[in-house]
């Protein structure tokens, strides 16, 4: 497992810094920096009170927490949310209540998402007239079966 150093800034001194729940987890828990109630199918931009400086060649991916998704229907609208290395603004999460009938209460300090930081290559695109053939070809969207 490789390690990188990421600078993080508390925009609110009361905010808890993200951490891994377990040493081998991929995602750092992000917490809400505000109280809110989401009605069924309502979405909201939620503050975390944090800003980060990712190293060049890395990106952050904000993803839902599986327990909140299955138990309450809380998800993230633009899953995964992308944080580019040159972004220095506040980390915010666009959450949505997918439960058809129940409100979801979010308290300041609740874990609402996970931040996964990954190395990302810079890609050089080369335009060609034809692509190489594969067994799959242009089959997609269920072409390999559903069971």
Spans of model-derived segments:
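DUTPase catalytic domain/fold
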Residues: 1-147
């Amino acid at each position: 497992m490789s390690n990188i150093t990421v600078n993080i800034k508390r925009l609110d001194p009361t905010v808890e810094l993200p951490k891994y729940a377990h040493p081998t987890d991929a995602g750092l828990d992000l917490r809400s920096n505000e109280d809110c109630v989401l009605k069924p199918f309502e979405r909201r931009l939620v503050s975390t009170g944090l800003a980060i400086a990712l190293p060049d060649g890395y990106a952050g991916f904000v993803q839902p927490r599986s327990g909140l998704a299955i138990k309450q229907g809380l998800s993230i609208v633009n899953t995964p949310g992308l944080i580019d290395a040159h972004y220095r603004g506040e980390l915010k999460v666009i959450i949505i209540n997918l439960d058809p009938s129940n409100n979801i209460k979010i308290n300041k300090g609740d874990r609402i998402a996970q931040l996964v930081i990954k190395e990302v290559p810079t890609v050089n695109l080369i335009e060609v007239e034809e692509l190489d053939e594969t067994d799959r070809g242009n089959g997609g969207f269920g072409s390999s079966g559903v069971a």
